């Protein structure tokens, strides 16, 4: 009877030893894992908030950018507007635009010297003809008016040549003067020709000046 009792006690002791060396409770691991989960969740929320704040700032910047660009365009337009306006050319009142010239047609008839003086008072000179096309247009104009006009061309007896008021000598390939080449001869333009007449005779005249910049 003694042997079985000893066996039972030893078995119990071994069983208790096994219980003492059992692994940690699964509940403790779960608590540990849930703690890290909460920390990660908080960090994720903070990161999401920062991301949303960054996006809001970016959207605000993009929304504000177009007005700035519009303002800059408006400023550039304002800067260029004076430049555009400064290139606009026009003739004074009672003057007529003719290519790149402004022409004034006298309403009275006077000698050539008085016509020259009148043009000078207007800041102009008697008409100078530059080429054949301009000559043709002026002859057509003279025909429409039914008049003849003094121009800025006079015979210089000392040099035996016709000279324009700017000092240049007449190019006979451009136009030919009909009539006498003598002292006190001035040129007139009609609808058919350019001819000489006495500078003392009374005729209408044409003044010219460059276009005015406004």
From Swiss-Prot:
It is a single-pass type II membrane protein. GO terms for molecular function: carbohydrate binding; signaling receptor activity; transmembrane signaling receptor activity. Residues 1-42 are cytoplasmic. InterPro entries: C-type_lectin-like, C-type_lectin-like/link_sf, CTDL_fold, KLR_subfamily_B, NKR-like_CTLD. Residues 64-214 are extracellular. Residues 98-208 form the C-type lectin domain. The chain crosses the membrane at residues 43-63. PROSITE patterns: C_TYPE_LECTIN_2. CDD domains: CLECT_NK_receptors_like (cd03593). Keywords: Disulfide bond, Lectin, Membrane, Signal-anchor, Transmembrane, Transmembrane helix. GO terms for cellular component: cell surface; plasma membrane. It is found in: Membrane. This is Killer cell lectin-like receptor subfamily B member 1. Gene3D superfamilies: Mannose-Binding Protein A, subunit A. It comes from the Eukaryota. Disulfide bonds join 119-207, 186-199. GO terms for biological process: NK T cell activation; regulation of natural killer cell mediated cytotoxicity.
């Amino acid at each position: 009877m003694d042997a079985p009792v000893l066996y039972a006690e030893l078995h119990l002791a071994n069983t208790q030893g096994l219980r003492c060396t059992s692994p940690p409770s699964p509940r403790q691991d779960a608590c540990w894992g849930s703690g890290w989960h909460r920390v990660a969740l908080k960090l994720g929320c903070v990161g999401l908030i920062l991301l949303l704040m960054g996006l809001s700032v970016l959207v605000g910047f993009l929304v504000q950018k177009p007005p700035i660009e519009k303002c800059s365009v408006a400023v550039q337009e304002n800067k260029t507007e004076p430049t555009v306006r400064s290139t606009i050319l026009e003739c004074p009142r009672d003057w007529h635009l003719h290519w790149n010239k402004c022409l004034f047609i006298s309403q009275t008839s006077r000698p050539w010297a008085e016509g020259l003086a009148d043009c000078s008072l207007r800041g102009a000179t008697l008409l100078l003809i530059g080429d054949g096309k301009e000559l043709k247009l002026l002859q057509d104009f003279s025909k429409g008016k039914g008049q003849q006009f003094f121009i800025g061309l006079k015979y210089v007896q000392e040099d035996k040549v016709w000279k324009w008021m700017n000092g240049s000598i007449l190019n006979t390939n451009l136009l030919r003067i009909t009539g006498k080449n003598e002292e006190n001869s001035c040129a007139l333009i009609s609808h058919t020709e350019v001819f000489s007449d006495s500078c003392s005779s009374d005729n209408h005249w044409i003044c010219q000046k460059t276009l005015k910049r406004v």
